[in-house]
From Swiss-Prot:
Major localization listed first in the record, in broad terms: mitochondrion
Pfam families: Mitofilin
Task of the protein: Component of the MICOS complex, a large protein complex of the mitochondrial inner membrane that plays crucial roles in the maintenance of crista junctions, inner membrane architecture, and formation of contact sites to the outer membrane. Plays a role in keeping cristae membranes connected to the inner boundary membrane. Also promotes protein import via the mitochondrial intermembrane space assembly (MIA) pathway.
Keywords assigned: Coiled coil, Membrane, Mitochondrion, Mitochondrion inner membrane, Transit peptide, Transmembrane, Transmembrane helix
GO biological process, one term: cristae formation
InterPro entries, per database record: MIC60 (IPR019133)
Protein name, UniProt field: MICOS complex subunit MIC60
Positions of transmembrane segments: 126-148
Transit peptide per record: 1-41
Lineage: Eukaryota, Fungi, Dikarya, Ascomycota, Pezizomycotina
Species of origin: Sordaria macrospora (strain ATCC MYA-333 / DSM 997 / K(L3346) / K-hell)
Coiled-coil boundaries: 434-464
Membrane topology: Single-pass membrane protein
């Protein structure tokens, strides 16, 4: 029923209204956008055909409680007119409405709720955090390395405080240096880097005149000639290529040493024996020749033997006179070692020319080095002499300048000393003159003071003498005059005391008059009248009397600003208040309209008491209060009213406040009047 009505309503508009029905289903409570895109049962879309003239047909009932609704008549689809290609006009006609073919029904898919996102686990979050932290750290470290190559201050901070920062910066700098200078890097890479470690030289390292052999070390001094010959032959065959290669290399390097003007330092080769002087440089060669085993003398061949040449004479070791340079000594030592090896191997004929050439070249190199040393020493001596002469000349000039400056300084100091002496002498003379003038003035003042003292003393003595003579002449009349003057002074004191008494009495009388004036103004008034002027006059007359000031300050300001009620007004107002209090005393706590009416009637019919009635009821208290008011006793009347409870006291609160104001004013006036009486009694 509901689907039929929805389908009939959908035919009226272009958009289906299934979204409204979707809210009525319990299983499809989702958003409007999701619901509007769903397909419902029996929702097959029909081709839309424009029918402007056909009126819309509404269902019989749109209420949800209708039993059934007849389906609307399906609209007829008009055939689409086609135009033949031959009759195609030049201007195309207006486009007709698009005919949508019917869509096949699809199964209804219930709406799927969005799956909630799973929360990431702790390890996954930790992994993401560590990964991001690592990436950020790498980026920051790379940025720090790059910026440290630009800024020197940041370079110092980065290499000092960041771990592995110095290694990274040095690695990048080495790469940059190798990229800029590839040739230098290729030449430097062959040399070992100076790591600062201590180099240990083995005891048997370095070049030696002995040929290294793999046999027994003492085989050459052995008595067995056969074993020595075999060992020597094996050693020569093994070491011959190395010795020849070293000799060729040294021979090739000799011309280079000659062509250079300065001797380049050679890397030190640790040797076992150090050469101290040229005399000892040839000692290893001689020792080696002496230590060699004695060879058989040459014997001429017999007639029946083949002819043979005598062996060549051994090569003499090199001796360079005056070879003090350590490089030349090392070369001589090296060449002598080579000669020793050649002589030992009987290769004299083969290497004699080369060794001779090497000797000549080494002698030339030594001579050139000596010449260069002599030349450098001569130039150095000349430069030293020139420097010494320059230093002597500069020292002489400096001494002369210092002497002239000292002389000028001494003259200036002498001149300043003389000027200072003159100034000090002048100042001391002025001080002496000033001291003398002051002493003279002091002496004159002392003399004048002495003269004045003597004059005063003489005048006193003269006065005493005159007084004595006058007293003697007048028989003591001067003493009587003194007594009269003292009596007159006593009379003056007595007169001043009586004047104070009179003033105090006058002020007391004025205070009495002011109090009576305030009281009269309050009693004569027929309605409340302010009495600010009277209080101001009373305060001025009291002349800052603390008692009067305290009494005036105890009065409520509203009392003297607006005035207080008279006795007649208080009695009249009490009668009205008493009537209301009697009515309220007859009412219960939750009184209604009837209770109020009955209380009003009963208050009229009640008998009133008279005099000082006994009892604590409301009527007795009101009767006593009225009696006290008629007698003029406001204090007791206020006490009686203050004893009421409940609504009776609430209704009489305003009247009680007025009575308290009147009592406060009366009490203050009584206190002021009592103070005035006490002052008058003190004067008596």
């Amino acid at each position: 029923m509901l689907r039929t009505s929805l389908r009939s309503v959908r035919a009226l508009g272009s958009r289906p209204s299934a979204a409204v029905a979707g809210r009525q289903w319990q299983a499809t409570v989702v958003r409007r956008a999701a619901v509007s895109g769903q397909r419902f049962f029996a929702d097959d879309k029909k081709p839309v055909v424009p029918e402007p003239a056909q009126p819309a047909v509404l269902p019989a009932s749109e209420t949800l409680t209708a039993p059934s609704t007849p389906p609307p008549a399906s609209p007829q689809v008009e055939p689409t007119s086609t135009i033949a290609p031959e009759t195609t006009p030049l201007t195309p006609p207006a486009p007709e409405a698009t005919v949508i073919p019917p869509v096949a029904e699809e199964p209804v898919v219930p709406p799927t709720l969005p799956t909630p996102r799973k929360k990431k686990g702790f390890f996954r979050r930790l992994r993401n955090f560590l990964l991001s932290l690592t990436i950020l750290g790498a980026i920051a470290f790379g940025g720090g390395v790059y910026y440290s190559r630009i800024n020197d201050a940041f370079h110092d901070f980065f290499t000092e405080y960041i771990p592995y920062g110095e290694q990274a910066v040095l690695y990048l700098e080495e790469l940059d240096f190798k990229k800029r200078f590839p040739d230098v890097v290729s030449r430097v890479t062959g040399r070992p880097r100076d790591s600062g470690e201590q180099v240990k030289v083995p005891a048997q390292s370095g070049a030696s005149w002995r040929v290294a052999d793999g046999g027994e070390p003492a085989g050459r001094q052995s008595s067995s000639i056969k074993k020595a010959a075999v060992a020597a032959k094996d050693a020569v065959t093994k070491s011959e290529p190395a010795v020849v290669a070293g000799a060729n290399k040294d021979t090739a390097e000799l011309p280079k040493a000659e062509s250079t003007t300065t001797v380049t330092p050679v890397e030190p080769v640790p040797v076992a024996v150090a050469v101290a002087d040229p005399a000892t440089a040839v000692a290893p060669a001689d020792t080696a020749a002496a230590a060699a085993p004695a060879k058989k003398p040459f014997k001429a061949p017999e007639v029946d033997e083949p002819s043979r040449w005598p062996p060549a004479s051994p090569i003499d070791p090199l001796k360079v006179n005056g070879a003090t340079d350590p490089i030349v000594q090392d070369l001589v030592h090296m060449l002598n070692d080579i000669i020793t090896v050649i002589n030992h191997d009987n290769a004299n004929e083969k290497y004699a020319p080369t060794i001779g050439k090497a000797k000549n070249e080494l002698s030339k190199v030594a001579g050139r080095i000596n010449e260069m040393k002599a030349k450098v020493e001569a130039e150095a001596s000349k430069q030293v002499k020139a420097r010494v002469d320059g230093f002597d000349k500069a020292a002489n000039e400096l001494v002369s300048r210092v002497e002239s400056a000292m002389a000028a300084q001494e003259a200036a100091w002498r001149r300043e000393f003389e000027e200072e002496m003159i100034r000090l002498k002048k100042s001391y003379d002025e001080k002496i003159h000033l001291i003398q003038d002051r002493e003279r003035q002091i002496a004159e003042e002392k003399l004048n003071n002495r003269l004045l003292e003597q004059a005063i003393q003489l005048q006193r003595q003269f006065t005493d003498d005159i007084k004595k003579h006058v007293e003697e002449e007048r028989d003591g009349r001067l003493g009587k005059l003194n007594e009269l003057s003292s009596a007159v002074a006593d009379l003056e004191k007595l007169t001043s005391g009586w004047n104070e008494v009179v003033d105090t009495n006058l002020r007391t009388q004025q205070l009495h008059v002011a109090v009576e004036a305030v009281r009269a103004s309050l009693q004569d008034a027929h309605h409340p009248r302010p009495f600010i002027k009277e209080l101001v006059a009373l305060k001025e007359i009291a002349a800052e009397d603390p008692v009067v000031d305290a009494a005036i300050s105890s009065i409520n300001p509203t009392a003297y600003q607006r005035g207080i009620s008279t006795s007649a007004e208080l009695i009249d107002r009490f009668r009205r208040v008493a009537t209301e209090v009697r009515k309220a005393s007859l009412l219960p706590e939750d009184a209604g309209v009837a209770s109020h009416a009955s209380s009003y009637v009963l208050s009229k019919l009640m008998f009133k008491k008279e005099g000082l009635a006994a009892g604590d009821d409301v009527e007795s208290i009101l009767t006593r209060t009225q009696t006290y008011l008629e007698e003029g006793d406001l204090d007791n009347a206020a006490r009686e009213i203050n004893g009421l409870q409940g609504w009776a006291k609430t209704l009489s609160r305003d009247w009680l406040g007025e009575v308290r104001k009147v009592l406060e004013v009366q009490q203050a006036l009584e206190v002021i009047q009592t103070e005035a009486r006490l002052q008058s009694l003190r004067m008596e």
